[in-house]
Structure formats: structure tokens, C-alpha cells
From Swiss-Prot:
Induction: Expressed constitutively throughout the growth phases, both in presence and absence of white light. The gene is htr2. The lineage of its organism: Archaea, Methanobacteriati, Methanobacteriota, Stenosarchaea group, Halobacteria. It is found in: Membrane. SMART domains: HAMP, MA. InterPro entries: Chemotax_Me-accpt_rcpt (IPR004090), HAMP_dom (IPR003660), MCPsignal_dom (IPR004089). It is a multi-pass membrane protein. Pfam families: HAMP, MCPsignal. Residues 717-740 are annotated as: Disordered. Residues 727-760 form a coiled coil. Transduces signals from the phototaxis receptor sensory rhodopsin II (Sop2). This is Sensory rhodopsin II transducer. CDD domains: HAMP, MCP_signal, PDC2_HK_sensor. Its main location: membrane. Residues 724-737 have a biased composition (Polar residues).
Length: 773
């Protein structure tokens, strides 16, 4: 019952296992319901997000497809309008080409007609459909005629909004492209929107797709009669059509409809995918129904568990509780047999074992009680023995107090200076007897020590007198040594200053030698560079001679080739002369043909024509021959000038070779002189370097002497300081000896208050010991 006081549960629950089980089952049911509700909410939210993403992605996919379709149509109409037949052909050729486009299926899907359109008169001049030829498009209400588009250039195109005309019974979208080179002509693709509307609306079961423009009018709708009408979404207060950017997509929902919207990149159209809200979220309702069924099933199962297992468990616990209370009241013969093999069977067995253990413990407790009574009797006897021993201890304590007083008196006498006092060591207690012997031994040792100290004090007084006398003699000698060392230090200092002055002079001499060596080295380097430059110049001159010789040879070959060309031109001139002669003969033949034609009257018309042709060709040939002859003469004249120039160049090259050869000879002479100068400068450089090294060696020797002199001065200064320190130390020793004698006198007067035996003999021994030390 005490454990229930700390339980957070009310007492009526904490005191009943059935109540606890009921509370636990109720809590489990609440947890299951809460988990089911949370799962349902999360599943519904996830499903709604998936549905929104799915519808929006579908609208984006269809927008991309529609974009591609429009781009293809624009590109196709633009390329068709550039065909030569539409820029340069006749109306008949254009009509024939348009019919071929349709019959050969060269048009994009959905194009029902192609028109060659006059933008000024709004007349269709040619068409792939014979019914449209000569039709005034403006009278039919076609927007590309009533409101003609303004093109930025020949590559521009225009897509109209859906429209209907009386000639056809379905909505049309026109794609218009200007004809290059003709501002008043355009090519128009007429596209049937029904097929495209059916294509984009057949992608998903349970949904349909529409296309609206930014004005809110349907461009495409599964119900073709709705094309051109106003879309309901544009009439809402929060119209999303005007807020969409090209390529942007969004999700919109109403009470009954879900919509995914995507605006096209290439045109102001918006693709809208519609899906019924109830059908789209049907899966969410199914999930919620399934979760409710699972929750009810779990609740029923928990109830069955509580009724079956819980009821049986409670009955078993109550029976076991009654038997446990009987055992607690001392009734250990209760029946603990059970046929259960589960945890309750184990618990019955545990209670049976506990009952056996209780019986054993009761038997052991009775045995322990008997043993305690026997121990009590033994304790009484022990107490009597202790009383007898206490009397004996009191007698021993009195004896010990007496001996302690005797020992104390002897120690007090020793403390007062009487070291001859001793104690009696016989005692009832062995330890006290040993203490007495130790006291006597200590007093003997202390008496001997005091005697030795008296003798030692006398010896110290005598030794202090001798030390004082010797210290005075050593002090006089130290002062003399210090004076001599100071004189040595002054001489060494003067010698060091002289060596430093010599070292400075040698330093200047060494620097001058090094500067001369450096200058000589620079001159040597310059001389070597000059020699190398001269050698390079000589090699370059040799190469120049070789190149100029090669140029001279090539010039000779060029002159020979030009002369050969001149000979070839002479031969060509002879051929031109032959051609000129042939032309003159041809002119004669043409003249004869003309005469024959004149004699032949009407029958000679053919001869006259041939004669005129031959004459014309002859004149042209003669002019060409004269031109060739003039060009040959010009080339021959230019070749002659070139030959003269090449010969003059060859002469100059020969003279240049001679000049370069003279330059080579001069460079060789310069190189020889430079090498001789370089040799002399190298010798000067080596001598200067040797002089610099000698100066450095002398400098090193002087530095060594300076160092030795400085060390000597330093050592002399150190020795002088040591002598002064020694003198001071001697004075301190003398003072210490005086102080030591005073303290020895004080010690001797202090030791006189102690009374000892045979002090003379001990003092002699101590004196001898001190003398040995």
C-alpha cells in the first residue's frame, strides 16, 4: 500500500489492476485514433500536393507541345513564303504550287488551306482550296484582313485569335508570314483547331484541357462550340490569367474543379487542365475509410483482449492475493497448487518457495535465540575476570607513577646543569626498566659531549688567534700582487691599442687591394667580352659572306631564267604574228563571202549572216592578238629592266663581299689585340688577388695578436680583481676569526654552568681531535 502513495494515478485506479488495465486499454485506443487521424491528415495533404503537381505538370507538358506546334507552324509558313515561286512567279504558278503543297502533304498537321493573300485589297489571289480564290477575306471577317498585322521584317510571323468564316463550319486560327520583297503580299496558313483541341484533351481520363488567351476567351475546348466564348475563370475576382509570365505555371482550385495553368513561351495563350475535385480526391476518401475501418478493428481487438486475457488475469491475481494475505497473517499451510504453466504458475511456485524459506528462517531464528542465551552466560563470567585484572592494573599504575617521578627528578637535575645525576632502573615493569637504562645512557653521552665541547671551545680560541695572525700576512701579500697585476694590465692595454691601430691600417690596405683586384677583374671581364664580341662579329661576317655569295648565285640564276623567259616571249610574239596573219586572211574570206551574198540576192541571206559572224570573230581575234602582243612587249620591257637591276645588284653584292672580307680581317686583328690585352689584365688580376690575400693574412695575424692582447688584458684585469677579492676575503676571514673567538668565549662561558666528571682528560682528547681536523 505504501507504493501507491507515490503513484500519480488516483487511489481507486492505483489500487485495482482491473482499473489499471481499463485505463491502459482506453489510452491505447486513444493513441490509435490519434495516429489514424494524423495519418489521414498527412495522407490527404500529400495526395492534394501530388494531385496539384500532377495537374500542373500535365498543363506544362501540353503547353510545351502547343508551343512546339506553333513554332513549327510559324517556321513552316515562313520557309514556304520564301519560295521563289511566291516572290517571282505568276499567279498561275503560285496556284499550282499551293495545290502541290496540299496534294503532296507538305503542310503541317491541322492546316486545311494555304492562301496567297493581297494585304492591300484583302483579296485571296491564290489558294490550295479552289473555293477561296477571289474571296475578300475582310468581308468574311478574317482578323488578318480586318486588322492586318504589322511585321517587323521578313522573318516575322503573326498568329491570329480563333475566328469563324461563312465558307467553313469550324473555328480557324491563321498563321501569317509576309512574302519577302513584296509588302502587299502574305502567305496565310488556315489551321483547324478541332483536331488540336481533341489531341490536347485526350491525355488523361477524368480531365479535359482548354486553351484561353489573356483576354479570357477559349482558343481550344473539347466542346468546339465553346471556342471563342469567354472562360469562367476570367470572370472571377482573382483572375490568375493576367498574372502569369511566359513559361510560368500555377495551380488554381474552386469548390468543384481543380485547374493547372501554364502560359506559352511563344504566344499569349494559357493551357488549362481541368479535373473534377471529387474524382481527383476520391483516393483520399478511400484512404480515410480504410483508416476508420482499421481503427474500429483495433478497438474491437483491444476490447476482446481486455475481456478475455484481462478477465482471466484479474481472477488469478485475486485468488493469489487472498492466499498471500493468509500467509502474511501466519497461516503457512495454505494450498499453493496450480495447473497453470505461465507466469502465474511461476508466481505460485515462487510463493511456495518463499513459504519454505520462511519456515527455514523461523527455525534458524529459534536456534539463534538459544545461542544468544548461552553467550550471555559466558559474558557474565568474562566480566568477573575483567574486574580482577582491573585491581592488578591499579597497583601497577601506582608503581609506574612513582618511577616516572624519579625519572623526572633526574632529568630536572640534568636540565639545571648537574649531569652527574642517575636513576635506579629496577622496576615491576620491564618497559619502565628499559626507559631508566636509556635515561642513564643518555646522561652519560650528554656528559661526555659537554666535556668535549668545552675542550673544543678552548681549541677554537687558540686557532682563531693563529688564523687572525696568518690572515694579516696574506692580506699584505695580496695587496702587493694586486698592485703588480694592475701595472701589467695598463701595459697590456697600451699594447692592445697599438695592435688595433695597426689592424685598422691593414684593413684599409686590404680594402684597397681588394678594390684594385675587383677593378682588374672587371677590366678582365670586359676584355674577355670584347674578345668574344669580336669573335662573334668575325663569325657573323663569315656567315654574311656566305649568304651574299648565295644571293649572288641566285641572282645569276634569276637573270638566266629572265633571259629564257624573254626568248619564250619572242616565240609567243611570232605565234601572235601568225594569228594576226590568219585573222587578216579570215577577214578576206569574210569579205568574199559578203560579196557572194550580195551577188546571190535573196538566196544569199545565209551567207551574209555567216560572213558577218566570221568577220566579227576575226575582229575580236585581231583585237585579242594585238592585246597579247602589247602585253608581251610590256613584259619584255619589264624583264629587261629586271635583268639590269639584277646585274647591278650582283655587282653591289660582289663589292659588299669584298668589304665584309676586309671587315673580317679587321675583326681578326682586333680579336688578337684584345686577347693580348686580356692576358695582361688576367696577370694583373692574379697579382692583385695575391696582394689582397697577403694583406688578409697579415690582417689575420694582427687580429690574432689583438685577440691575445685583449685576452691578456682581460686575464690581468681578472687576476687583479681576484687579488682584490682575495684581499677582501682575507679581511673577511680575519673578521670571521675574530667573531669566531668571541663566540668560542661565549660558548666556554655557557659550558661552565654544566658539572661533569674527568673534564681534563676529555678536553685533552678533544684538543687532539681538533688538531687532527
Amino acid at each position: 500500500m505504501d507504493s501507491n502513495r507515490d503513484s500519480p494515478l488516483p487511489s481507486f485506479i492505483a489500487g485495482s489492476y482491473a482499473a489499471r488495465l481499463g485505463v491502459a486499454l482506453s489510452f491505447a485506443i486513444l493513441v490509435i485514433i490519434a495516429a489514424g487521424v494524423l495519418t489521414s491528415v498527412q495522407a490527404s495533404a500529400t495526395l492534394e500536393e501530388d494531385v496539384a503537381d500532377d495537374i500542373t505538370a500535365l498543363s506544362e507538358t501540353q503547353a510545351v507541345q502547343l508551343d512546339d506546334w506553333l513554332t513549327t507552324s510559324r517556321r513552316n509558313v515562313r520557309s514556304t513564303s520564301r519560295l521563289p515561286v511566291f516572290t517571282d512567279g505568276t499567279d498561275t504558278e503560285k496556284q499550282q504550287r499551293l495545290e502541290e503543297l496540299r496534294s503532296n502533304e507538305e503542310l503541317p498537321p491541322g492546316v486545311v488551306a494555304v492562301h496567297y493573300f493581297d494585304t492591300e485589297t484583302s483579296e485571296i489571289r491564290a489558294s490550295s482550296n479552289q473555293d477561296f480564290i477571289g474571296v475578300n477575306a475582310a468581308e468574311q471577317g478574317a482578323p488578318f484582313a480586318t486588322d492586318p498585322p504589322q511585321f517587323d521584317g521578313p522573318d516575322d510571323t503573326h498568329v491570329t485569335e480563333p475566328f469563324s468564316v461563312s465558307v467553313v463550319d469550324h473555328p480557324i486560327v491563321a498563321v501569317v508570314s509576309p512574302v519577302p520583297g513584296d509588302e502587299d503580299r502574305a502567305l496565310v496558313y488556315m489551321i483547324d483547331l478541332r483536331e488540336k483541341a481533341d489531341q490536347i484533351s485526350s491525355h488523361r481520363e477524368g480531365s479535359f484541357t482548354t486553351v484561353v488567351n489573356t483576354d479570357g476567351e477559349f482558343v481550344s475546348h473539347p466542346n468546339h462550340s465553346m471556342i471563342g466564348s469567354t472562360a469562367p475563370i476570367s470572370q472571377m475576382e482573382s483572375d490568375p490569367l493576367g498574372t502569369l509570365e511566359p513559361g510560368q505555371r500555377m495551380f488554381h482550385e474552386t469548390d468543384s474543379m481543380l485547374m493547372g495553368l501554364t502560359r506559352l513561351e511563344s504566344h499569349d495563350w494559357v493551357v488549362m487542365v481541368h479535373s473534377d475535385r471529387e474524382a481527383a480526391y476520391a483516393l483520399s476518401d478511400q484512404i480515410n475509410s480504410d483508416l476508420i475501418g482499421l481503427i474500429l478493428l483495433a478497438v474491437v481487438n483491444l476490447g476482446l483482449i481486455g475481456v478475455t486475457i484481462g478477465g482471466n488475469t484479474i481472477a488469478s491475481l485475486r485468488r493469489l492475493s487472498v492466499k498471500a494475505e493468509a500467509m502474511a497473517d501466519g497461516e503457512l499451510d495454505v494450498d499453493l497448487d496450480t495447473s497453470r504453466e505461465d507466469e502465474f504458475g511461476t508466481l505460485y511456485a515462487a510463493f511456495d518457495n518463499m513459504r519454505a524459506n520462511l519456515r527455514t528462517q523461523i527455525s534458524e531464528a529459534e536456534t539463534a535465540k538459544q545461542e544468544a542465551e548461552a553467550a550471555k552466560e559466558q559474558a557474565q563470567a568474562a566480566r568477573e575476570d575483567v574486574e580482577s585484572e582491573r585491581n592488578e592494573m591499579e597497583a601497577l599504575t601506582g608503581h609506574l607513577e612513582l618511577k616516572a617521578q624519579q625519572y623526572s627528578d633526574a632529568l630536572d637535575a640534568a636540565a639545571n646543569g648537574d649531569l652527574t645525576a642517575r636513576v635506579k632502573t629496577d622496576s615491576m615493569n620491564d618497559a619502565m626498566a628499559e626507559v631508566g637504562e636509556d635515561i642513564n645512557t643518555t646522561l652519560d653521552a650528554l656528559e661526555d659531549t659537554i666535556a668535549d665541547m668545552k675542550a673544543f671551545a678552548t681549541n677554537v680560541i687558540q686557532s682563531s688567534d693563529r688564523v687572525n695572525s696568518n690572515a694579516e700576512r696574506v692580506d699584505r701579500a695580496s695587496k702587493q700582487v694586486s698592485k703588480s697585476i694592475n701595472e701589467i694590465f695598463e701595459g697590456t692595454t697600451e699594447q692592445n691599442e697599438g695592435l688595433e691601430s695597426a689592424a685598422a691600417e691593414m684593413q684599409n690596405l686590404s680594402a684597397t687591394a681588394q678594390q684594385v683586384a675587383s677593378s682588374a677583374q672587371q677590366v678582365a671581364d670586359t676584355s674577355q667580352s670584347a674578345a668574344k664580341v669580336g669573335e662573334d662579329g668575325r663569325e657573323a661576317a663569315q656567315e654574311a659572306i656566305a649568304e651574299m655569295s648565295a644571293i649572288e648565285a641566285e641572282t645569276g640564276e634569276t637573270v638566266e631564267e629572265i633571259n629564257a623567259l624573254d626568248d619564250e616571249l619572242d616565240e609567243i610574239g611570232e605565234i601572235v604574228g601568225v594569228i594576226t596573219s590568219i585573222v587578216e586572211q579570215t577577214n578576206m574570206l569574210a569579205l568574199n563571202a559578203s560579196i557572194e551574198a550580195a551577188h546571190a540576192d535573196g538566196d544569199g541571206e545565209g551567207f551574209a549572216v555567216v560572213a558577218d559572224e566570221i568577220k566579227g570573230l576575226a575582229e575580236e581575234t585581231k583585237e585579242a592578238a594585238a592585246d597579247i602582243e602589247g602585253r608581251i612587249e610590256a613584259i619584255q620591257e619589264q624583264a629587261g629592266d629586271t635583268v639590269e637591276t639584277m646585274e647591278s645588284t650582283s655587282t653591289r653584292i660582289t663589292e659588299g663581299v669584298s668589304t665584309v672580307e676586309e671587315t673580317v680581317d679587321a675583326l681578326e686583328t682586333i680579336v688578337e689585340y684584345t686577347e693580348e690585352v686580356d692576358t695582361g689584365i688576367q696577370e694583373i688580376d692574379r697579382a692583385t688577388e695575391e696582394q689582397a690575400r697577403t694583406a688578409q693574412d697579415v690582417m689575420g695575424t694582427i687580429d690574432d695578436l689583438t685577440t691575445i692582447s685583449q685576452q691578456t688584458a682581460t686575464e690581468a684585469d681578472t687576476v687583479a680583481g681576484a687579488a682584490q677579492d682575495q684581499s677582501a676575503s682575507i679581511e673577511e676571514v680575519s673578521d670571521s676569526a675574530t667573531e669566531l673567538r668571541q663566540r668560542a668565549d661565549d660558548l666556554e662561558s655557557l659550558l661552565d654552568r654544566f658539572t661533569v666528571e674527568n673534564s681534563a682528560g676529555t678536553g685533552t682528547d678533544s684538543t687532539a681531535a681538533v688538531g687532527d681536523d
